[in-house]
Amino acid sequence: MVDQEISSKLLSEVHFRQVRQSDLLALEWEGEFVHFRRMYADAYRRSQLGEAVLWVVDHPQLGILGQLFVHLDSPRHELADGVYRAYIYGFRVRSPYRSLGLGTRLLQLAEQDLVKRGFAWSVLNVSRENLDARRLYERSGYRVVAGDPGRWSYLDEHGIRHDVNEPAWRMEKRLIP
C-alpha cells in the first residue's frame, strides 16, 4: 500500500482528463487488459462520434492509474438513453493506488460532466462479487435498483469471441434533483 506521504504527493501530481488516441495501448495496463484492445478502440471511436466519454487518471511518471468510460446512449435504454440516463462502465483503478481517493474523484468528475451535458441519471452495473466497488458507489450516492444477469461478450485482440457471465447489481444515482 502506498503510504500517506506518497499518497498526498501522488494526488497532487495526477491529471484527470479525457482519453487520447495515444492512450489506447496504455489502457491495457502492460498486458493485463490486452484482451479488451478491440473494446477500447471501439469505445474511443464512439467518443469521437460524441456517443461516449472516456476518462483517465494520468500521472506524468507512472502513466494511467485509473479509467472510467461513459456510454451516453445505448440500445439498452434502461442503462443509457442519450438524453436523461448515461451508463458508466470500465471503471478501474490500479490495485496499488486504490483507497487513495482517485476513484472517488474520477467518478465525481464523470458525474459533473454528465450534469453539464444535461443528464439527470448516472447508471452502472457492479459485479455482485465486487463488494469494495459497491461500497464506493453507495458512499457516492448510488442505490441498487435491479439485478442484472451480467451476460455480455467481446472480441479479444485475436478476434476470438468471449462470452462473459458476471451477475451484477444495477445501481443508479440521480444527478439533477
Feature-to-residue mapping (PLM):
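Short secondary-structure junction motifs
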Residues: A52, F119-W121
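Conserved glycine-rich acetyl-CoA-binding loop
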Residues: G90, R94-Q108, V115-R117, R128-R135, ...
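Surface-exposed loop and edge beta-strand positions of immunoglobulin-like domains
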Residues: R17, N125-S127
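A generic secondary-structure micro-motif detector
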Residues: L100, S122-V123
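C-terminal "cap" of GNAT-fold acetyltransferases
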Residues: A120, S127-L131, R139-A146, G150-P177
